[in-house]
Amino acid sequence: MTIKIAVLPGDGIGPEIVAEALKVLDCLRSDFGLAVETEHALIGGAAYDAHGTPFPKETLELCRAADSILLGAVGGPKWEPLDYSLRPERGLLGLRSELELFSNLRPAVLYPQLVSASTLKPEVVAGLDIMIVRELTGGIYFGKPRGRRINEDGEREGYNTLVYSESEIRRIAHSAFQIARKRNRRLCSIDKANVLECTELWREVVIEVGKDYPDVALSHMYVDNAAMQLVRNPKQFDVMLTDNMFGDILSDCAAMLTGSIGMLPSASLAESGKGMYEPIHGSAPDIAGRGIANPIATILSLAMMLRYSFDDAVSAERIGKAVQTALDQGFRTADIASEGTVEVGTAAMGDAIVAALRAV
């Protein structure tokens, strides 16, 4: 069977880092016989510039027809003055919603070669391996009513709605428990059940779902404490289950424990197993076009795609080993460079990983 991948480079550094992931994909195709086809489409600011919308119909149709999606990044200051409905990020949110990509997997793994790049002491972060499972299509980012208005005192007022249904919570909880079963069988659910009724329900439903997974140790933590614990003792966590907004914040916090946000991939999955894969970092418009962006997160996103959407653990492990080898050889992009390493650009890092892949 030939895998069909929709490629959405997006904005900023997106096209540069996606190009390196495609080098790796081409190597898997030419050297290891992976049957794969790719087709490109626009999303985000690039799509708005070309079509007047951040999420063109053609892009949605391509993504629906594809087996999986590889995304670069969206957004940038150029499009910030636009109406909220036309901003690049709305294209990404629309894609998640249309394809029902409800389960966002964000690993935070510290490579042994990069322990010194973390802002925390080596004894605190060495061996870090956390998986954050974030609900992606509900919560305050999608809740209605939302908007801005003038209140009865004549003041401007903004309002959003935090809402989750029982079925939405149950669905993401099952996803998190299943992932925990494949790891170290520990799941910590993050909420604010002491002040928010929505997350009080979240905790109740997670406890109910947990009864189906007696082999997984379930714990609960308020989000403010979770943020503190990620800095104080991050290795206490295995799998963290969060709602949309809490996960958005905590996953970036966890990412910086690893030394660079440029190292971390993510997966957004539908119940069918179809997924969208992207680095967790943004479009970094300040370095776009300079050839210095770190492509590793995007390359590892490709590895996650092969593992989670196509059950191809062999190819995923080949990519992971190739990344490890390139790091062992001392290659570093600017964001992870340190004394005694070889600082290289985006393309050179991609080339080093491809060379290591061929030698695996």
Curated annotation (Swiss-Prot):
Cellular compartments annotated: Cytoplasm
GO annotation, biological process: L-leucine biosynthetic process
Record-listed Mg(2+) binding positions: D224, D248, D252
InterPro entries assigned to the protein according to its UniProt record, in alphabetical order: IsoCit/isopropylmalate_DH_CS, IsoPropMal-DH-like_dom, Isopropylmalate_DH
Recorded metabolic or biological pathway in which this protein acts: Amino-acid biosynthesis; L-leucine biosynthesis; L-leucine from 3-methyl-2-oxobutanoate: step 3/4
Class in the EC hierarchy, top level: oxidoreductase
This enzyme's EC code(s): 1.1.1.85
Highest taxon above the source species: Bacteria
Similarity comment: Belongs to the isocitrate and isopropylmalate dehydrogenases family. LeuB type 1 subfamily.
Protein name as catalogued: 3-isopropylmalate dehydrogenase
Gene name of this polypeptide: leuB
